[in-house]
């Protein structure tokens, strides 16, 4: 019994856990480094190396960016499940984000928007799939009982990366300027991908593509039913500020108070 218990404790976590921990740590390092200086960069004058946007423009861009960052993981997870697999999706996502961070270190408004698009798409491919890959590793009977603690360790990497990014961002911004601060995020993401590549032999068996089963909706139909409403509501939101529904009091009353009064 003692020998069996000892063996079980020694094999408590998959060998890939430290690699995924470090990969996620470096990815979140880059993500939160960029996010931490994003608003300041947009507001800073072009003479100082910033974008020189107005507070209103900054708010629109920042809000749109965050909204799309939280939308794309659904699409990236779907494509990984059905078509690409988790490992390939993570590599694609990491490379796109690294390219986006390096793009932000360059000047030009077009480059700025293209870089944001790359980060948004990269996050969609990366973020949901590394967590799913870790979960698949814990599906083995020998690891299943330690899944919660494994995720706790994994998420600690997020906290460490986010914490360290603040100091690195401040150091590079103060001493070398905006470009080097964004480039540091790109190098962090590349380091994470190097660590992930080293884990290939430990994660291969967990990288599975789920075949469609009878009754499943096709990938094309899922994308249709998600993307069309997204663009429709996006256009509606763009048009609303120019009319009566553009004030907080009116739309809150129409869409919030009236249904409550009607049904309750």
Question: Model-found features: residue ranges?
Answer:
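Intracellular loop-helix junctions on the cytosolic face of multi-pass helical membrane proteins
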Residues: 1-19, 141, 170-264
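Short amphipathic helix-loop junctions that connect adjacent transmembrane helices
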Residues: 34-59, 245-246
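Interfacial helix-cap and linker-helix signal at transmembrane-aqueous boundaries
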Residues: 42-43, 79-81, 103, 168-177
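Central cavity-lining transmembrane alpha-helices of secondary-active solute carriers
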Residues: 59-81, 127
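Primarily marks hydrophobic transmembrane alpha-helices of the MFS/SLC 12-helix fold
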Residues: 89-90, 151
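C-terminal ends and interior cores of transmembrane alpha-helices
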Residues: 92-113
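Hydrophobic core of transmembrane alpha-helices in multi-pass small-molecule transporters
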Residues: 100, 111-126
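Intracellular juxtamembrane helix-capping segments at the cytosolic ends
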Residues: 125-141
């Amino acid at each position: 019994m003692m020998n069996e218990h000892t063996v079980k404790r020694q094999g408590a976590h998959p060998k890939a856990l430290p690699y995924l921990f470090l990969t996620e740590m470096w990815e979140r390092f880059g993500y939160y480094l960029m996010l931490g200086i994003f608003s300041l960069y947009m507001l800073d004058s072009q003479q100082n190396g910033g974008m020189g946007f107005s507070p209103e423009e900054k708010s629109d861009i920042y809000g749109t960016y965050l909204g799309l960052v939280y939308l794309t993981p659904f699409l990236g997870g779907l494509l990984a499940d059905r078509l690409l697999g988790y490992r390939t999706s993570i590599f694609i996502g990491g490379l796109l984000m690294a390219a986006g961070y390096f793009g932000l270190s360059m000047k030009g408004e077009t480059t700025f928007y293209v870089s944001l698009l790359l980060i948004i798409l990269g996050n969609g491919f990366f973020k949901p799939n590394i967590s799913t890959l870790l979960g698949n590793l814990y599906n083995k009977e020998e690891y299943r009982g330690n899944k919660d603690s494994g995720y706790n360790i994994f998420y600690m990497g997020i906290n460490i990366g986010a914490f360290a990014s603040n100091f690195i961002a401040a150091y590079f911004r103060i001493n070398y300027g905006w470009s080097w601060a964004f480039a540091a995020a790109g190098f962090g993401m590349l380091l994470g991908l190097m660590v992930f590549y080293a884990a290939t032999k430990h994660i291969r068996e967990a990288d599975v593509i789920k075949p469609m089963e009878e009754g499943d909706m096709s990938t094309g139909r899922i994308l249709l039913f998600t993307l069309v409403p997204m663009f429709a509501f996006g256009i509606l939101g763009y048009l609303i500020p120019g009319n009566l529904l553009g004030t907080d009091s009116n739309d809150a009353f129409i869409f919030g108070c009236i249904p409550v009064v009607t049904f309750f």
